[in-house]
Amino acid sequence: MKTFNIKSPDQAIHQALIDRINNLAKPEGSLGMLEELALQIGLIQQTLSPRLRNPHNIIFAADHGIADEGVSFSPKEVTWQVINNFLGGGAGINFLCRQHGFELVLVDGGIDFDFPEGLDIIDRKVRKGTRNYLYEAALTGEEMEQAVTAGAEVVSDCHHRGCNVVSFGEMGVANTSTSSMWMSFLTGIDLKDCVGAGSGLDSEGVRHKYNILKQAKENYKGNGSTEDVITYFGGLEMLMAVGGMLQAAELGMLIIVDGFIMTNCLLAASQFYPEVCDYAVFGHCGDESGHARLLEYMKAKPLLNLGLRLGEGSGAVCSYPIIVSAVSMINEMHTFAQAAVTKYF
């Protein structure tokens, strides 16, 4: 797999950031997670005056062979149909990106559809969907490496355009199934606790989904390594997000993590480079079964809990105003001396 150069942020500035935050005209700790965020972002950017520039939400999209087993509420063609809605500006993530000032980047990583030329979508298609991992490996090692590299290159391009904060979204029918497989293998959590309704399965549908995934897990004869698991089960959009997150960390960008699927991508990325988590903020706890358990496993503190289960980066983008507030706090609040206020705690 592509190698990355990721280091934890230098801690030399840590105490100066703490002093700066504690000398703002407020009781120490009274702005809670805003203070934690300001510290984290200051460390990432190595400055007492951090700035957020040109935020991007990157949506990687691809199809999954396991969708042929009826594990999703939606048929496979919904993947490309939703992408068309993104392109038309009418999806949930479109209005959120407009509202919060994000540039939306769409990437075809492996959709089982041929889009006409000239659309505002980046073509990094590795193949038309993954193979059905109920019966065989979803991807080859070479295809996995292509996907990780493609995701990294998309993020590098965003960085070259002045972006220093990035969120990731996804679109791919049946990708909650693949995420459940990643979660169970990479955490050791029982598969039943990792499987949920996805885009809208009823209880019978969830039962069928679990039974299919349980059989797929039993059929897997790999070595159980992170690289083997994410190759065997795919999917292409998730692997691109892994590469994108690792590249963002290498470039010192702030990563806003979305829901169940993107949290699994960060989990996988952290198995290779644990330091990637130093650059990540968890936007929200989603409504997909397994997400809260996964966040707990990763000792994550999500900023929001709104019952979202849309994906697309929606929860990450919704959380952005809180991150902006943290940066505004450290840059705009007066110190006790500037405010001529006696330090009252």
From Swiss-Prot:
Reaction it catalyzes: 5,6-dimethylbenzimidazole + nicotinate beta-D-ribonucleotide = alpha-ribazole 5'-phosphate + nicotinate + H(+)
Upper lineage: Bacteria, Pseudomonadati, Bacteroidota, Bacteroidia, Bacteroidales
Pathway per the UniProt entry: Nucleoside biosynthesis; alpha-ribazole biosynthesis; alpha-ribazole from 5,6-dimethylbenzimidazole: step 1/2
Cross-referenced InterPro entries: Nict_dMeBzImd_PRibTrfase, Nict_dMeBzImd_PRibTrfase_bact, Nict_dMeBzImd_PRibTrfase_N, Nict_dMeBzImd_PRibTrfase_sf
Function summary: Catalyzes the synthesis of alpha-ribazole-5'-phosphate from nicotinate mononucleotide (NAMN) and 5,6-dimethylbenzimidazole (DMB).
One Gene Ontology MF term: nicotinate-nucleotide-dimethylbenzimidazole phosphoribosyltransferase activity
EC number of the protein: 2.4.2.21
Protein name: Nicotinate-nucleotide--dimethylbenzimidazole phosphoribosyltransferase
CDD domains named among the record's database cross-references: DMB-PRT_CobT (cd02439)
Residue positions of the active site: E312 (proton acceptor)
Species: Porphyromonas gingivalis (strain ATCC BAA-308 / W83)
GO biological process, one term: cobalamin biosynthetic process
Alphabetic keyword roster: Cobalamin biosynthesis, Glycosyltransferase, Transferase
Entry similarity comment: Belongs to the CobT family.
